[in-house]
Amino acid sequence: MANELNAETLNVALESIDEFAARELPDSLLIELDEEDTFPEELVRRMSSAEELGIQLLFVPYEYGGMGGGAFDVYRICERMAAIDVGLATSELATFLGSDPIRVGGTEEQRREYMSRIAKEGVLFAYGATEPEAGSDLGALKTIAEPVAENGKVTSYLISGAK
């Protein structure tokens, strides 16, 4: 994430989050979601949608239809969201975390396909990094992904370990 938003753009994004929260996230709703242990999928989709709040656009590189935000911007957005509701902040951060391996290590075709869909469609991602023996300690993971090649081109990965 080499890019960063300029200060004005970041401030507008943070203000937009505050305005959305004031309008759409009353304390009573946040308490209800917490008490019912409910994932508010439709609300998260609205927050991700370019037509509403477009939080995910901040994380997507310019060339795929996003705003090209950097690590500092991710931190500030998540910090602001967490001040409103940790569950919603985690939900929004999940797409960033889930798409980061594609952004960093995916092929150009994969980046174009999936990063563009986050920007255009508000597609949500998830990130899984646990194993029975490791929990969420990434350093203790034992799963290995071995490339599977056909005609000299990697077409998939064979994954070992227990998930």
Predicted segments — roles?
Residues 1-92, 112-113, 117-120, 153:
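Amphipathic, small/basic residue-rich leader segments at the start of a protein or domain
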Residues 39-48, 103-107, 128, 140-144:
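Alpha-helix boundary/capping detector
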Residues 61, 77, 98, 107, ...:
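Hydrophobic/aromatic pocket-lining and membrane-interface residues
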Residues 66-67, 109-163:
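Glycine-rich, Trp-frequent "lid" loop and neighboring beta-strands that shape
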Residues 71, 78-79, 87, 102, ...:
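Alpha-helix boundary/interfacial micro-motifs
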Residues 78, 82, 99-103, 115, ...:
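Short, well-ordered alpha-helical packing segments
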Residues 86-109, 135-138:
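N-terminal glycine-rich flavin-associated loop
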